[in-house]
UniProtKB/Swiss-Prot annotation:
Superkingdom field: Eukaryota
GO terms for MF: glyceraldehyde-3-phosphate dehydrogenase (NAD+) (phosphorylating) activity; NAD binding; NADP binding
Record localization: Cytoplasm
GO cellular component: cytosol
Keywords of the record: Cytoplasm, Glycolysis, NAD, Oxidoreductase
Lineage summary: Eukaryota, Metazoa, Ecdysozoa, Nematoda, Chromadorea
Residues reported to bind D-glyceraldehyde 3-phosphate: 157-159, 188, 217-218, 240
Catalytically driven reaction(s): D-glyceraldehyde 3-phosphate + phosphate + NAD(+) = (2R)-3-phospho-glyceroyl phosphate + NADH + H(+)
Native organism: Globodera rostochiensis
Protein's recorded name: Glyceraldehyde-3-phosphate dehydrogenase 1
Subunit structure: Homotetramer.
EC assignment: 1.2.1.12
Binding site for NAD(+): 13-14, 35, 85, 322
Amino acid sequence: MVKPKVGINGFGRIGRLALRAAVEKDTVQVVAINDPFIELDYMVYMFNYDSTHGRFNGKISTSAGNLVVEKEGKATHTIKVFNLKDPAEIKWAEVGAEYVIESTGVFTTIEKASAHLKGGAKKVVISAPSADAPMYVMGVNEDKYDPAKDNVISNASCTTNCLAPLAKVINDEFGIIEGLMTTVHAVTATQKTVDGPNGKQWRDGRGAAQNIIPASTGAAKAVGKVIPELNGKLTGMAFRVPTPNVSVVDLTARLEKPASLDAIKAAVKKAAEGNLKGILGYTEDQVVSTDFLGDSRSSIFDAGACISLNPHFVKLVSWYDNEF
């Protein structure tokens, strides 16, 4: 099988973990990485050592300006490294990169991300929400993808990827009248280690390791983009908490059809073992956040944490590794 050739723009948290996933799953060939701020030797160090996910289970080195990744003694990826600020200048075609993962968090509109097409890329996947690019969430609306016209797409946010599969199952089975989502979210790179200035929301500048910080999120509203029948029915907020990784969604919803918690659990379990296997998970174990470190599933339903006030009003809980 010929593996799709992929380029990565931005070698931060998501870019590095995308490369780790590519090496582990062995379904795509990463042929190039661009990052204007990280030198080659530093890329080796940052990829090899990770405070959250641990040391890379393999070997990475440099050769003639390339990164060379080895797994089980075999070189699996030889990766050309660019250090360019303008994505239009990256010569993706020279290395055969047809697909680009846009993981800088900067080029998140169709216009900005389309710059990769000038260098020879054929498709661009933005690893963040986008104001105007078509948004696709696996298990929810990927069947709507049109390869003839969708050259730049968004894979939405980690939180939307957690919420949307769960919301789809509940809406399909019982109907959602309206709902409020809260994500209890681990710290991210945009936060401050100690109190500092922040231009938008002042409390976003408070020390991440010292505080629980209320924050805005568009993740719930974004579900309306991938599940049109829920458009305008969901909104939400976040609490940033001092943990390094793994977050959890709390969906409180009013249902059209009456449903017991057992019926809801059965519906989610059926989906998790059926058409959403590998995307939506289900557990009845007494789990905590670190139990999901490195879990590649988008959303893991915590049956034991869910509660119901009455058959029309429920609180549902689902975990996700917000980096992986």
